[in-house]
Amino acid sequence: MKINTVLFDLDGTLINTNELIISSFLHTLHTYYPNQYKREDVLPFIGPSLHDTFSKIDESKVEELITSYRQFNHDHHDELVEEYETVYETVQELKKQGYKVGIVTTKARQTVEMGLKFSKLDEFFDVVVTIDDVEHVKPHPEPLQKALQLLDAKPEEALMVGDNHHDIVGGQNAGTKTAAVSWTLKGRAYLEAYKPDFMLDKMSDLLPILSDMNRS
C-alpha cells in the first residue's frame, strides 16, 4: 500500500519547544513547590497531557497549575522556541508532491497556532488535531483517527512522525506506519525500544523513505 498521508507531532518534532516546555514546568513547580523539582525531574513530563502530568503531582490544583504553566509558556514562547533544520523545506516539498499532511498534538489549539505561526508552518497544514478536539490523547488512536478522517485518508496509507513513545504507539494503535525522530530529548535508544518503522536523523530523511515506499 502506498503512503499518501503524513501526520506529525508538533513539539520536539516540527518545532524545538524543549526549553520552553522545561522552563514552563520549572517556573510553575517552583512557584507552587519551591526547591522540589530539578530539570531532570521534569523531562518525563514531556509528552503526556498537562492534565495527566499535573494530576499526578497535585489533583486538587490541576487547573491552577495548567493556567500558570500556559501563562508562562505563552509569555516566553517566541524567545524560547527554535526551528529544526530541514523541517520547513521537507513539509513544503511534501505539499508540493501532493501528500496530505496533518498535525496530531496533545497541546491546546491556541498554543499550537502560536508555534505554527512562529515557524511559518501554518500555511501547509489544513488539518490540526489538538487536545481540544478529542476525548482521548495519544497513544489512544482517537486523535490520529480524527486527523485521518478529516484528511479522507486510510491508516494503511499514512505515516505518523514523532519524538515520543506516545506518537509511535499511537500510530501503531491507529494502524499507520511510524517514524521516530532521533533528535528527541529522550534519546534515540528510548524510541527504538518502541520499534518504529523508520528512524529519522533529520526531517528531510522522510523524502527518500516515502519515495522508496511508494516505488515498491
From Swiss-Prot:
Its EC number is 3.6.1.1. GO terms for biological process: DNA repair. The active site is at D9. Keywords: Hydrolase, Magnesium. GO terms for molecular function: inorganic diphosphate phosphatase activity; magnesium ion binding; phosphoglycolate phosphatase activity. Its cofactor is Mg(2+). GO terms for cellular component: cytosol. Hydrolyzes pyrophosphate formed during P-Ser-HPr dephosphorylation by HPrK/P. Might play a role in controlling the intracellular pyrophosphate pool. Belongs to the HAD-like hydrolase superfamily. PpaX family. This is Pyrophosphatase PpaX. It comes from Bacillus cereus (strain ATCC 10987 / NRS 248).
